[in-house]
Structures are given as C-alpha cells and as structure tokens.
C-alpha cells in the first residue's frame, strides 16, 4: 500500500496539447511520446524490467541480468533489492580462494521465502502446462496465506502445492490431487490437509468438480476420437442424473464412463491405460463401472455407432 501511495503522489506527465492522451513509452530511445501529435513529452525514461545482458566478468551465469528481475508487486519492496556481484580484488576472496560475495541480495527473509515459493509454483505449473494466469492466482493465494501466518508449521512447498490446486479449481481448469502431487515433493494427504486449512483461513471456496471438468483432457491424453469423448460425457452425465454412482468421486465416474465408451467403440482402452492418465487405481475404475454397467443401454447417446454391442461389453 505504501509503494502505491508514493507512486500516486508523483506528478503525472501529460502532453500540453492533448492532456487526456495516453502517452506511448519508447524504452529503447527513453522517450514518452504523445500518440495524437507525436510530441516527445518526456525523455530519459527508466525501464524497470530486466536487462538481459551479461556484464559480470563477461561470462554467462545462471542469471545473466544486469539489473536483476523485473518488479514484483507481491513482494514488500517490489524486489528492488541490491545484488552484490563477484569482486575481482584480493579482499573479495577468503583464505581458500572462494568468492565471499556470490550474488548476495539484501532481501528480507519473508521476501526470500516467497520468492522461493513463487519459483516452485512456476516450476510445478510448467510441468503440467498451466497458463500464466494460474501461476499469478497461485502466487496471490500463497502471499495471502503466508502473510496471515495461519498455516504455521506447514512446509511452504505443501502450501504452494495446495494453492496451485485451489487456483486451478477457481480458474475452471481443475487438476487432481495426484496430478499436483506428481509435480511436487509433497504427499497427496499433506496437500489435502493444506487445501482445507487454506480455504478456512482465507474464507474462500471452490466450485464443486464435475465429470465434465476432466473428460476432455483425459480423452485427449488417451488419443480418443471426438465420438468416444461425447459418448463418455453423455454416459457420465446420465449416470449422475440417474443416481447410479452415489458417493463416487467425479474422477472415478468419468474414468468408468470413458472405459465403457471406449469398449463399445473401435478405439478400446484398458483400465490401466485410463487409470495411468488420471492417477487412479484399476480397482477404483472397476467399482464405478460395476455401478453403471446394469444400466448401460440407457446411458449411451441415441446416435452412438457401436463397434461392440452393449450386451457384449465387459462385465468385470
């Protein structure tokens, strides 16, 4: 809040001829230009983004930026911290010849913890191809939880994993606990515990997941044609409407529907293949399948083209 008020207090640069025009910033030239008349209103504009050139000993290091990372509004100081580069004099090395100052930062411990969590969140999101908006929402959730100190005693990695799970749910692209678990070092049970604690601490909620939330992705990963995906979606929806699967998770119902639809088509998939995609055991699929199998004739869409008749489907 303090940094925002300081920015608001600064005089606003405007074009004298067009005061309402939004100025265009040319960072290469360092100018601020009026788009209406082309007048250069301000010069020597400072670019607060990263400068991706290497200046430290003319060698490319892990982080080759000259002025550090771009501003991060989630950190207390916007991450405008000081970076101490490697020295060249004798005083820069200890008695064993090791550098004393290897990219040290004057950053608070809380900001350092959040930065580490943000990096872990980005890494996890990249592994399961999640877009940037999911990462941003996850970072915001983590910051709220961290500043409230409501989950003391829980590992930051576990909190970050749970925040990622919540962000996916809130953005309408849910992932399973096992999918999040697979890209983190945290157990499914611990992520689940943190998930419940975070919802309570932030007084927020997530929409209930449905079979449709996973159907498209599961079928795509199984390389199933559109007809099978549509049939599986129809089967799962009808099974829920007819109350055939009380107490079963939407994920297991979706997988059972995919198994039934694929077995009735020419593109058959085994229980193991389907289970591997969603991280669910074969027995879980079988339990849900057995519940919907007796009503199989009522579950398929009327225009479905059977390769295997309903009465020939596996009974398990």
From Swiss-Prot:
A zinc finger (TFIIB-type) spans 11-42. GO terms for molecular function: acetyltransferase activity; histone acetyltransferase activity; promoter-specific chromatin binding; RNA polymerase II complex binding; RNA polymerase II core promoter sequence-specific DNA binding; RNA polymerase II general transcription initiation factor activity; TBP-class protein binding; zinc ion binding. This is Transcription initiation factor IIB. The modification Phosphoserine is found at residues 70, 76, 92. Sequence repeats lie at residues 124-200, 218-294. Found in a ternary complex with TATA box-bound TBP. Part of a TFIID-containing RNA polymerase II pre-initiation complex (PIC) that is composed of TBP and at least GTF2A1, GTF2A2, GTF2E1, GTF2E2, GTF2F1, GTF2H2, GTF2H3, GTF2H4, GTF2H5, GTF2B, TCEA1, ERCC2, ERCC3, TAF1, TAF2, TAF3, TAF4, TAF5, TAF6, TAF7, TAF8, TAF9, TAF10, TAF11, TAF12 and TAF13. Associates with TFIID-TFIIA (DA complex) to form TFIID-TFIIA-TFIIB (DAB complex), which is then recognized by RNA polymerase II (Pol II). Found in a RNA polymerase II initiation complex. It comes from Bos taurus. It is an enzyme of class 2 (transferase). Residues 189-193, 249-252, 283-286 are annotated as: Core promoter DNA-binding. Belongs to the TFIIB family. It catalyses: L-lysyl-[protein] + acetyl-CoA = N(6)-acetyl-L-lysyl-[protein] + CoA + H(+). Residues 244-316 are annotated as: Necessary for TATA box-bound TBP complex formation. Zn(2+) binds at residues 15, 18, 34, 37. The TFIIB-type zinc-binding domain is necessary for the interaction and recruitment of RNA polymerase II to the core promoter, the formation of a fully competent pre-initiation complex (PIC) assembly and basal transcription initiation. The C-terminus is necessary and sufficient for interaction with the TATA box-bound TBP complex and for the formation of PIC. Transmembrane segments: none annotated. General transcription factor that plays a role in transcription initiation by RNA polymerase II (Pol II). Involved in the pre-initiation complex (PIC) formation and Pol II recruitment at promoter DNA. Together with the TATA box-bound TBP forms the core initiation complex and provides a bridge between TBP and the Pol II-TFIIF complex. Released from the PIC early following the onset of transcription during the initiation and elongation transition and reassociates with TBP during the next transcription cycle. Associates with chromatin to core promoter-specific regions. Keywords: Acetylation, Acyltransferase, Chromosome, DNA-binding, Metal-binding, Nucleus, Phosphoprotein, Repeat, Transcription, Transcription regulation, Transferase, Zinc, Zinc-finger. The keyword Ion transport does not apply. InterPro entries: Cyclin-like_dom (IPR013763), Cyclin-like_sf (IPR036915), TFIIB (IPR000812), TFIIB_CS (IPR023486), TFIIB_cyclin (IPR013150), Znf_TFIIB (IPR013137). Acetylated. Autoacetylated; autoacetylation at Lys-238 stimulates transcription activation. It is found in: Nucleus; Chromosome. GO terms for cellular component: chromosome; nucleus; protein-DNA complex; transcription preinitiation complex.
């Amino acid at each position: 809040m303090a940094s925002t008020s300081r920015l608001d207090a600064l005089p606003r640069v405007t074009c004298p001829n067009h005061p309402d025009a939004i100025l265009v910033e040319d960072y290469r030239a360092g100018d601020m230009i009026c788009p209406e008349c082309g007048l250069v209103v301000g010069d020597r504009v400072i670019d607060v983004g990263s400068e991706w050139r290497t200046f430290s000993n003319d060698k490319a290091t892990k982080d080759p930026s000259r002025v550090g990372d771009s501003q991060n509004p989630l950190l207390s100081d916007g991450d405008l911290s000081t970076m101490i580069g490697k020295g060249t004099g004798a005083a820069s090395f200890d008695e064993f010849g090791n550098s004393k100052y290897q990219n040290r930062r004057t950053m608070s411990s809380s900001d350092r913890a959040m930065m580490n969590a943000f990096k872990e969140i980005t890494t996890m999101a990249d592994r399961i191809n999640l877009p940037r908006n999911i990462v941003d929402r996850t970072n915001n959730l983590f910051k709220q939880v961290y500043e409230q100190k409501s989950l003391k005693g829980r590992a930051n990695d576990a909190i970050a994993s749970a925040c990622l799970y919540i962000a996916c749910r809130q953005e309408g692209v849910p992932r399973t606990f096992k999918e999040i678990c697979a890209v983190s070092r945290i157990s499914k049970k611990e992520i689940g515990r943190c998930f419940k604690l975070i919802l309570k601490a932030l007084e927020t909620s997530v929409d209930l997941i449905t079979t449709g939330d996973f159907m498209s992705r599961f079928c795509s990963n199984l390389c199933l044609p559109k007809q099978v995906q549509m049939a599986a979606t129809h089967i799962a929806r009808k099974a829920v409407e007819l109350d055939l699967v009380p107490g079963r998770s939407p994920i297991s119902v979706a997988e059972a529907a995919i198994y039934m639809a694929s077995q009735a088509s020419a593109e058959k998939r085994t229980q193991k293949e389907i289970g591997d995609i969603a991280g669910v055991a074969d027995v879980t699929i079988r339990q849900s399948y057995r519940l919907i199998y007796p009503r199989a004739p009522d579950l398929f869409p009327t225009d479905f083209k059977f390769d295997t008749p309903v009465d020939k489907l596996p009974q398990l």
